[in-house]
Amino acid sequence: MPYKIIVDLSHSEQVEFPELALSEDDYDVDYIDKNDVLDFDALEDYDILFIGNIQHTKNKKTDKFTPDQLKDIKRFVGEGGGFLLTSGAGGDNNISMKQGSIRVLYKITGVRRFWNGKILEASSNFLVKKKNVLITELFSHSITKGITELVFPNCTFFNLTEEEVEDIISTSEKAGFEYHYNDEVGNVGKVPICVVSKFFRGRSVTVGSSEWLLEDNDFGLDAGDNLKFLDNIIKWLSFEI
């Protein structure tokens, strides 16, 4: 049976699921298009919901989550669904939970804030440019098994809840961060950029970069073990590992 993945495009997401890089026999991918509605009826027949790099604006409502949508996503994951959320440079653009940003999903993801900017790694921890985070040290987890090198371009970092969330990838102690609101760079040190969590009967993975999923990018799926990492994520979210 192929993994059934539903990809949300109704909230101004910038990244689609890289189905062309994967076996058609293993993955069945459908989409909630920008004019469609994300609700439980759209989700219930799938194994995994993917939301990739929402670019929140200050005033538009279409890139925000309504209380009903939050309730339906919680129901989907709580009943055993998998949830993959990826962010990127700019994070949640400082849009508050009250306004309906991706922060509202914190009960599922364990992430309270996606910082508005991008990681700039120190020497030996980036590939070609500082914004391409090179990861060679990973915490032990089913998702990181067999992984020796990952590349996360244009990556943000998270503030986590104190609830059941596990950090499996962090930056180096010397990592910097470029804040988008003033373009200044400051040291942030070791901060989480990939976390996993459990929500009732379901599972969630949150990654601070989305460009590692791109199929036509030198630092995307073909870089390091990025493709195997995605495969491990899908298997873990589907309770295969």
Describe each model-derived feature in a short phrase.
Residues M1-L9, E13-V15, Y181-I241:
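Extracellular ligand-binding/catalytic regions of CAZymes and related secreted enzymes
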Residues H11-E13, D36, F50, I54-K58, ...:
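Solvent-exposed loop/turn segments at secondary-structure junctions
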Residues Q14, P18, Q69-D72, K98-I102, ...:
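Stable alpha-helical elements in mature extracytoplasmic
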Residues F17-Y27:
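A short, Lys/Arg-enriched amphipathic alpha-helix followed by its capping loop at the start of a domain
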Residues D26, D45-D47, V165:
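Short, well-ordered alpha-helix to beta-strand connector turns
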Residues D26-A42:
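A short, well-structured beta->alpha microelement
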Residues E44-Q99, V207:
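Short alpha-beta junction capping motif
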Residues G90-D183:
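An acidic, glycine-rich "communication" segment
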